[in-house]
Amino acid sequence: MARKMKTMDGNHAAAHASYAYTDVAAIYPITPSSPMAEATDEWATDGRTNIFGHTVQITEMQSAAGAVHGSLAAGALTTTYTASQGLLLMIPNLYKIAGEQLPGVFNVSARALASHALSIFGDHSDIYACRQTGCAMLCESSVQEVMDLTPVAHLASIKGKIPFINFFDGFRTSHEIQKIETWDYEDLKDMADMDAIDAFRKNALNPNHPCQRGSAQNPDIFFQVREACNPYYDALPAIVQEYMDKVNEKIGTDYKLFNYYGAPDAEHVIIAMGSVNDTIEETIDYLVAAGKKVGVVKVRLYRPFVASALVDAIPDTVKQISVLDRTKEPGSLGEPLYLDVVAALKGTKFDQTPIFTGRYGLGSKDTTPAQIVAVYENTTKKQFTIGIVDDVTNLSLELGAPLVTTPEGTVNCKFWGLGADGTVGANKNSIKIIGDNTDMYAQAYFDYDSKKSGGVTMSHLRFGHKPIKSTYLIHKANFVACHNPAYIRKYNMVQELVDGGTFLLNCPWNMEELEQHLPGQVKKFIADHKIKFYTIDGVKLGIETGMGPTRINTILQSAFFKLANIIPEERAIELMKAAAKATYGRKGEDVVKKNWAAIDAGAQNVVEIQVPESWKNGEDEGLEMTHATEGRADVVKFVNTVQAAVNAQEGNNLPVSAFTDYVDGTTPSGSAAYEKRGIAVNVPVWNPDNCIQCNFCSYV
């Protein structure tokens, strides 16, 4: 069955599929799940109908799970979208909803829980905290899988009479944009069991056939009633596989409760769930081509955990198993997935197979192919971590050289921007233009800190003629753009270019000024590696076109399309102008025309820099870092050992020992004085003639 290709992120994929089976959506915003709720709300307002021909009824309230419980009890198919602390607050309701056999679906973009510090980024801490509630749990590894398998959660919940937590990785999947195949609602309707839906509605609390729920039971019968649900959980895996088979039949996939990928005679297999599986698959392709016998088992149905299905998925030739968990449970014998695997394999043909356990990816820590290779090469550390340097408890695995495992022909682009300057938004438009108007696969991911605005943003774009499984950040790029000239001395960005790559710098400098402002190591790298170097004065063009000095995103997007040559320049300009009209049309014709002028200006004002031979003699001047030299000793130590590296985007290189004094999450006050970033376009000057003594300048 041919499906429409669209470019979207994981949140919108989940919302699209879940909307079809939803009568009521109880929503409340929490990062990174909010876009699911926002999309559902927007579609309902626009009058989109579900498979029953109705628009979804939206209710927004703090007690979203309480509203879900009540709505389900009243006979409405109900969905909510949440993550992290928001999901934790739902746990009491999850027990009740599962105990009352109500088929709700909780779509979760899995996120870290606040422990020593808050993290808005992704791991599996939140969903693991719900594994004992009685809810079934289904996991997806990619944006395409979110689209394909979210219907399975809804349909199996209805037929199996058990609520589902349908989850995928926060940010890495929820916010990653991919070109994917999408469901038509007629196909989703075709898979629905209308008899099961009617039975659910007839079982609702209704004055026409009253019953009592929420009673209290005494020791004489509580245990027996609790055990009476066992047949439903025993039957659920077969129901899930039944709907996976229906999906497979429609779209030609091979979804199972556990899917194996790799060498048929693999000797070392990783077991994992979530977005890391795509990185593992890409690494396996690289290793198997080199003769290695490795593979991965991808966990899809985490609850109920079906031991027999796991055993069937593992090749008989396996000599070692490594289980990867994206959480930390201090004091436990191991993390949850590891303990499940150990219990599942006990007494089977893999009873004597060594099972190693590793932690990875906490708080969206990047997981690269080199780290996966380290897991496959590890034969000594039964407990390990990857992605960090643990020089305190020495659990981390040593990494080899970085690997390039992306499919041949994949183009990698990286954009350094300033939070709220429009760079991220422009790149979202760019990837959709590429995805929707070419036959190429496209992927976009956006890396930024927790600041509301003004922080560093890094946009990672990939596109090519083969599917893209690279669920990790770009560190070797064909194209790098720096949208703020202050960054050139603060961050290592040019060094991430491949030989012959393209570097675009937004700056007002001519050749003489470039000689003065570019650090020696940047000049040397550009010259030594034959980098094609271009500049554009986005601020000047922004002022001239009426966009203003800070809204330079459209100008730089146009410059990117000119230099990248993915789409013919005239066609790219035409598509950008159409996107600008669609985005800003409601704000009036004047705003649209300013954007069109900016698009034309960006394409026409790119300046190619002829790199002089003398740049090969450039000396390494190091990065500009603010260090503390006086003041309180605790502040000086923190700024110099931690903050300076973090501000230079080098925090990933800090070892565990750098944080032994901050293990409880506390940091010394007064460190913001050393975080001046020098990013302003203009510097204010006090004018005594205009001063009204408001004292506002004392706050600036």
Regions found by a protein language model. Give the residues of each.
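Thiamine diphosphate
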Residues: M1-A129, G134, P151, F171, Q241-V389, H460-R462, A477-F479, T502-N553, ...
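Conserved thiamine diphosphate
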Residues: I120-G170, M194, F350-G361, D528-K530, ...
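Active-site cofactor/cluster-binding pocket
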Residues: K4-T7, P304-A309, T317-Q320, L324-E335, ...
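Iron-sulfur cluster-binding cysteine motifs and their immediate structural context
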Residues: E282, G670-A672, N695-V700
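Conformationally flexible catalytic loops at phosphate/diphosphate-handling active centers
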Residues: G53, F164-N259
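Anionic-ligand anchoring segments at beta-strand to alpha-helix junctions in alpha/beta enzyme folds, i.e.
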Residues: V24-Q57, K250, P264-D265, V269-R300, ...
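Cysteine-centered iron-sulfur cluster-binding motifs in ferredoxin-type domains/subunits
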Residues: S18, I321, V683-V700
